[in-house]
Amino acid sequence: MSKFIKIINLKLFVVLFFLVIPNFNNAKEILIYADSISYDENSNIIARGNAKIFQENRIILSELIIFNKEEEEIILPTKFTFKDSDENYFEGENGYFAKNLEFAEFDNPKIKLNDGSRLIGKKIKRIGKIDIISKGVYSPCKSRIKIGNFICPTWQLEGEKILHDNENLFLYQKHSKMRVLNTPVFYIPYIVTPSPLRKERKSGFLTPSLALNFFDTKTSQSTSFPYYFNIAIDKELLFTPMINYGGGVDESQRFVFDYNQVISGGSFKTDLTFDSNFENEDNNKWLTDASLITKYNKNLNQNFRIQVDSALQTSKNYIQKTKPNDDLSYKNSLSTNLNLEGFNLRKVDDYFKVSLNFYQTNQENEDNKIIPIVLPNIKYFLGYKNHDGFVNSSTIEFYNIFREKSNLVHAKKQQKISHKYNFTKELIKFNSKISFDTIIYNQIFNTEDKLIYEDNYKTGAYFRLFPIISISTETPFILNKYLKKFTINPKLSLVGSSGSSNSNRLSNEDSTNNDFTLENIYELNRYSGNDKMDNSKRITYGISAYKDNLKTTFSQTYEFTKNSNFHKEQGNDDNLSDIIGEIEYSRNNILTYNFRYDVYHSYLKKQNINFSTDNNIGKINISYLDQNSKVNNIVTKDIETVNYSLISKSFNKFSKIKFNGLYDLKKEINKEYGIGYSYFDECFGINLDFNRKSYEEDNLKPQDILTLMFSFKNIGSYKSTNLAVSENDKQDISWESYTLDNDEFTNK
């Protein structure tokens, strides 16, 4: 037995000697192992039984390997497995490899890429980093579906020729056909997609999209050809031209530029969209409409940061038409804001900000002439100073605001210089926390053409000294005897001010009518901003009680001032304010109840119930709102609505359903609702969503939106939206392509 082993070792040594010694200058030598190694009459090396060839971190496994020394080829007549240096696995038969393993050709290839994607075909030819597969099929799906007697992946791409570029990481397919559930869904003569092995961005065309638009008996088409530019490691541009044609409509083009850049200490992003119809006859105007959205953020140094946020459009509603899902579509006005912020300039906690603000209306019923321009707004917070427990701070502010036309609220032009001084002292006495707070405003206004009534305008300079002082106390204690570990915290606050009512000669530029809530009831100035002052003398009292998962809070105010502006604007007719309260219970579920109760008229002016849970069914949210028009001077109608939503847990492993809606109990209609289904496995996703929006105007019909989207791993998403009101109204059926993060797909 030992003699047999010695012979085997001798043969192995001879093989290694003849393979390595003649070419020792070549760094990529191969090693051959097998149960049996022999030579044929042509001095070819024949390895049988568990044969292996190693070259650096590449390996070939087979039951029979023949090495042709003269041609320097590795012949593989039977089934074999090859692992390359990138951990990709190849299976095949009846083929050969060059000695350096860079060139190969074999039948029935089966390739498993290192991300789990698969490629199979009839024949493969490997030239360096290029794999050319004849009659190939590509799919990233691991799961299989049985349809009749056929077992197939969820989806796959079939190509007459598939070329996989392992170096530039592109997948080229000729005469490509996609099958979903073994059903052909589309054909394209030539398609280029990023390789599933891609880890870095590359420039190139993305999947084009085709849209069919049906208008009565006419049909028009639009096509887009997105191209991605990988400009640099920190810069990218997506250019998408869209062409509309046919159906008797004007030929037009839309061009979208989406540019992103990472800069030192920040980022820059801009989206440019413009429409053109330069193909029309007798047309001398190539640009019809456009929008430009820009975001720029940069830390200039350790103390300063600059931010630019801009949205511009050439006509009203253009962004609403081109970007209906963007938050900008729902704003009354677009803005261009330039902010320069400074930190830790003189003190560690000071803060400096300069803002330039320009606005543009975004709604048909808005007048651009009353939209303000802020040039500039400057604020400087000097930081806190603490002297023996006395904490004080100061804020200096200046603004210059102007517009074309004034109204009852806003002047044509106004400048303000304001100094705010804040003083606070806290004491712990008698088991209570006692706080003393003082705010003193010194302000100078220069106002031009402020409309008082009808054609009566006022212009002038005004000085205002407005102090507000308060003393407050709270005394928490625990009830151990009756309610074990129940904490009770009563609170009392006395606030006094000059009592001077806000003048209608001043333009209100930065104050808004805040709701009367638990969040601001103890504030000294309950208005946001300081153009309007809370001219109130009042006492505020409340009590909080909490234990573990239960918390309750109740508060009320008594006004000593008859002409308290904030008190009146919040719908309070007498000295006693409404009672406001909140009850919250949170454990596995969260239930909150907020209310505002009018004590004089004995009715709930506002109540809101919120319930949310995350259980075995899914995430459920239900919100009920009942609000009277007297809550403030902005709300003009009574409101009673129910808002609801459900996002289910996954069922059947990959499926989810969702629905949501807003039901108007006053009008007994669903103002909006939607229902959707989604399926996402490890390689394929589908979304089907239906949404309806109703309008208060009788002449406006409900808007129905049905959206179908397919998502394919490593390929992207294709979305179709159908807006349909009736058979005779316009219907848009459009397929759009989207990039998709592969993290959306489940790896269960």
Q: Where in this protein do the model-derived segments appear?
A:
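Classical Sec-dependent N-terminal signal peptides that target proteins to the secretory pathway
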Residues: 2-27, 65
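Short secondary-structure boundary/capping segments
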Residues: 3, 322-328, 505-510, 570
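Sec-dependent signal peptide cleavage junction
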Residues: 25-40, 728, 737-745
